Curated annotation (Swiss-Prot):
Keyword line: Endonuclease, Hydrolase, Nuclease, Nucleus
E.C. no: 3.1.-.-
InterPro entries linked to this entry: Poxin-SLFN/SLFN_N, Schlafen, Schlafen_AlbA_2_dom, Schlafen_AlbA_2_dom_sf, SLFN_GTPase-like
GO biological process: cellular response to magnesium ion; cellular response to manganese ion; mRNA catabolic process; platelet maturation; rRNA catabolic process
Protein name: Protein SLFN14
Region (Required for ribosome binding): 390-569
Native source organism of the sequence: Oryctolagus cuniculus (Rabbit)
Any one cellular-component term (Gene Ontology): nucleus
Positions of the UniProt region annotated as Disordered: 157-176
């Protein structure tokens, strides 16, 4: 097979395998006199198909031999169709499309898509497994599904550490079993000589195989068939291969002594067996256990020849006759998998090699083996992808929508004419979505290019995907290569990470603001009609795959989806929590930092209202902060007050109370807990002390951020009962969650004197690790220490400038100071720095305090005033960094969703501090 071209020499952003000149058409292929050439053409095409199926799909390009060939009239050829049917028994049309372009036939190959509903989904496609088993008297080359089943059995047996043994059977002359043939064969094996035409008293079975060769080339024939039978016996229950016995008459003939050198034959057999590929699940990794014995065959006391007996013991793991006939794209060529690679991919074992697909462009990372590996993303992302798609990318509108809106607004404002140009480019499509990004290259893990203004992905009805790359410098020679690679990698991501099951191709197009500019041959990129999004359901499936891809990357779109994803998780968690409302009227809810307890508390108010059908003014929310109270008032119709107001007022109509951020409470104005309980659980004198009613009193607190442990008014931890602890819903980026986990770990290792033993017992590193993995999304966390105030301000200004250029808004950002008195000092430095960097058009830079959290401006306030509130991007500013500052790290980190920047004026943080 010719080495395929997969670089930018090809028009399609795909792996393009060139198989040379091929004869197509049923009649033409029937007339071929060179049967060897016919088989070679067939084999080259089928190998290329297998390799592309296993490597994310692509295109096979064949030069048509007959100049009068017409695909519509002549078809492919029966032998080619049969080969495709064997490779894809459930329908080749699901994976293959054909298109004639002049004197070339293109075969479009979709990425292999395992049937996830199957108990044993096949992760890759194979021509033959070359893993054999005995089936009575036959050696069967197992189908891929049967091979997978065998591998699973071997894997489980190795994990159990027990080998299946067959107990000895009591002798009974009236019973005959297959095991008897094995015993009789073992008796033959013990002999030293046999007689010519002696008839053996047993036949072939699961454990016995007879072979007789009349050809002159005995040794080559033995070496040809030996791997099949050794693999079959080793993978079943062991057995005997007896060479020199007729399988029909069971007579001993042997191999004539003139044709065989017994010592050489024995050596050849041993060498052949020792070279067989094996795969081990066990730690011992033994070799194939076999014994070769040569028996003399005599004819009237004269040496006639030899019988060769190969005894094969059952193998602990898997023995292959040869490497599986399965192919992938590696180093720009269709390459056969080794047995080890094949097993790892079949079983989807994470340690599988990741370099099976390489790209000729060193600076552009290749799709690698992820094209045929299972998607690696949080399970909940897959569960919520439909809801997220409908929230951000609804397909019901009969227009072309530009998303994300904030980025598009910024982009079109800065670059006049771009919006009209994109509308022209997307004409005549009337229904679809164009997803803009500052760099789709960066979003899929490639290097960003400064000469690219933006990328835009068109997902439209009745169209394949189109990736528009808007160039700043149209003379840049690398533009076409850039667009080609981004399209290829984005397609791979949609399949491997997003799990898109349909046929997908992305057409790259280069444009500039002055008008359309297409690279050479750009207009020649055509995909079959089946690659178009035919229905709204197809669009939704593709957009849901894009949602998953985006959530697993770092971008504005990822952050917008991530915030909504965390909101869905919180709503789900509240559904579970609210199931306790009916039977648990009083409850202490201990929440880890990052679990968004205020959001849980707000949703609990709604659940109380719906469950008990009460008026909003009968439900009271109590918190410590005025700013948090104002925020909650905008979120719910229920009454919301601070603890101070609660202690000073009377609330005769209140039936249910939810108390939030009680870790900040103190008993300065009285016993708030007793007052709350007297409202929700009042007693009537003279009525036998019976409860008038049992209202809800739910108390939310973060036990790691208790400020006044001695005077906070809470019952002592042992008396906080009934109690629920929420540790498995850390709703922020993985990098931020790790900071919180590290801080909590250090707190428990060196606890302050006012921390209760109960709080220490709450933190279990294993449980926290599970919480991180369950909902982990990528984010950003950076730490800088030993900075001046000016350096801190410059860092914040530069970061904000970069973020705003990518479409983030001032309302996404909170700059939090450790102390309230630091706000004024930082504000002046920040304003100067932002004027220098022209952040958000410097004249518009406005800082708001926590009270303006629902406004459009950057928040600049103390972390304490921001209690209970969150923003996507948080800068934590502190005058110093001490190793005892875990409390403030938790405060900063628990306010951030996707971006956290910790900046310290003094004190160098050790390298391992945040690990």
């Amino acid at each position: 097979m010719e080495i395929p071209k997969t670089g930018v020499e090809t028009l399609y952003p795909e792996f393009v395998v060139e198989v040379g000149r091929v004869t197509f058409g049923e009649e033409n292929r029937k007339k071929m006199t060179n049967s060897c050439l016919k088989r070679t053409e067939n084999l080259n095409i089928i190998k290329a198909t297998c390799a592309l199926l296993n490597s994310g799909g692509g295109v096979i390009k064949a030069e048509i031999h007959d100049k009068n060939y017409n695909y519509q009239c002549h078809g492919l050829g029966h032998d080619l169709e049969t080969s495709f049917q064997k490779l894809l028994p459930f329908g080749s049309q699901k994976y293959l499309d054909y298109m004639q372009q002049g004197h070339e036939l293109l075969i479009f190959v979709k990425s292999w898509n395992p049937d996830v509903s199957s108990l044993l989904p096949l992760r890759i496609c194979s021509l033959r497994s070359n893993l054999y088993q005995r089936d009575v008297t036959s050696a069967i080359n197992l189908s891929a599904s049967s091979a997978l089943e065998l591998l699973r059995e071997k894997q489980h047996a190795a994990q159990r550490g027990r080998r299946r043994l067959h107990p000895p059977r009591a002798s009974n002359s009236n019973l005959q079993e297959e095991e008897d043939m094995k015993m009789l064969a073992s008796e033959v094996f013990k002999k030293d000589r046999l007689m010519y035409k002696e008839k053996l008293n047993f036949t072939e079975s699961t454990h016995v195989e007879f072979k007789r060769f009349t050809t002159k080339k005995v040794v080559p024939r033995i070496k040809e068939m030996l791997p099949h039978y050794v693999s079959a016996f080793a993978n079943t229950q062991g057995g005997y291969l007896i060479i020199g016995v007729d399988d029909k008459s069971k007579e001993v003939f042997g191999c004539k002594k003139e044709k065989v050198n017994p010592d050489l034959l024995k050596k050849e057999i041993e060498n052949c067996i020792e070279k067989l590929p094996t795969f081990h699940f066990c730690h011992e990794k033994p070799k194939i256990n076999f014994i070769t014995k040569i028996l003399n065959v005599y004819q009237k006391d004269v040496l006639y020849g030899y019988v060769c007996v190969v005894q094969v013991e059952p193998f602990c793991c898997a023995v292959f006759a040869e490497a599986p006939d399965s192919w992938v794209m590696r180093d720009n060529a269709a390459t056969r998998l080794t047995a080890e690679d094949w097993v790892l991919m079949m079983l989807d074992i994470p340690s599988a090699p990741c370099n099976l697909v390489t790209d000729s462009n060193a600076h552009l990372k290749s799709p690698a083996s992820s094209a045929f590996r299972s998607p690696v993303c949080p399970t909940k992302v897959l569960e919520f992808k439909g809801a997220l798609q409908r929230h951000l990318f609804p397909v019901t509108q009969k227009t072309i929508q530009f998303k994300p809106e904030s980025f598009c607004k910024k982009l079109f404002s800065d670059h006049k004419g771009l919006e009209d140009l994109m509308k022209t480019q997307t004409y005549p499509y009337s229904q679809g979505i164009v997803v803009f990004s500052r760099s789709w290259a960066g979003d899929v893990g490639l290097r960003k290019e400064d000469r690219v203004l933006c990328d835009a992905l068109l997902i439209a009805l009745h169209s394949p995907l189109v990736l528009y790359t808007v160039l700043i410098d149209p003379s840049w020679a690398g533009g076409r290569e850039y667009a080609w690679n981004v399209a290829l990698h984005l397609k791979r991501k949609l399949q491997s990470v997003g799990g898109y099951p349909g046929k997908v191709g992305i057409i790259p197009r280069l444009i500039q603001l002055a008008g359309t500019w297409c690279g050479p041959g750009d207009g020649s990129v055509h995909y079959p009609q089946s690659y178009q999004l035919a229905t709204e359901d197809d669009m939704e499936d593709l957009l849901q795959a894009l949602v998953v891809v985006s959530l697993c990357s770092r971008s504005l779109l990822s952050d917008q989806l991530g915030c909504e994803f965390f909101n869905l998780l919180i709503a789900e968690q509240c559904e579970v929590l609210s199931q306790s409302l009916q039977e648990t009227r009083e409850l202490f809810i201990h929440c880890f930092p990052g679990t968004r307890k205020t959001a849980l508390a707000i949703k609990t108010l709604e659940k109380i209202r719906d469950l008990f059908r009460c008026r909003p003014k009968e439900i009271l929310y109590v918190c410590e902060s005025d700013f948090l109270r104002d925020f909650v008032i905008h979120q719910t119709a229920c009454l919301a007050v601070t603890r101070k107001t609660f202690m000073q007022g009377e609330f005769p109509k209140i039936k249910h109370i939810v108390m939030d951020e009680t870790e900040n409470f103190c008993s300065k104005y009285g016993d708030w807990y007793s007052k709350a309980r007297s409202i929700t659980h009042p007693r009537v004198r003279g009525a036998g002390n019976e409860d008038l009613h049992h209202g809800i009193l739910w108390i939310f607190l973060d036990p790691f951020q208790v400020r006044h442990s001695d005077v906070n008014g809470l019952p002592p931890p042992p008396a906080q009962f009934p109690r629920k602890t929420i540790t498995n819903g850390i709703h922020c980026a993985q990098e931020i969650a790790k900071v919180m986990k590290g801080a909590m770990k250090r707190i428990t290792e060196n606890p302050p004197s006012n921390m209760s033993p109960h709080t220490l017992a709450l933190f279990r590193e294993a449980a926290c690790g599970e919480a991180l993995g369950a909902h982990a999304l990528p984010g950003v966390c950076e730490t800088k220490a030993d900075l001046t105030v000016e350096q801190i301000a410059n860092y914040v200004a530069e970061r904000c400038h970069g973020l705003f250029q990518c479409g983030y808004l001032p309302k996404d950002v909170a700059i939090l100071c450790r102390r309230e008195e630091d706000r004024a000092r930082y504000k002046l430095a920040l304003l100067r720095a932002m004027e220098l960097t022209e952040t958000h058009s410097a004249t518009e830079v406005v800082f708001s305090q926590a009270a303006g959290v629902q406004g459009e401006h950057i928040i600049l306030d103390s972390v304490h005033q921001f209690s209970g509130l969150h923003r996507n991007i948080v800068f934590g500013l502190s005058p110093e960094q001490r190793l005892s500052e875990e409390f403030h790290q938790l405060c900063f980190a628990s306010k951030a969703i996707k971006h956290l920047y910790l900046l310290y004026e003094r004190g160098q943080v050790s390298e391992n501090y945040y690990k």
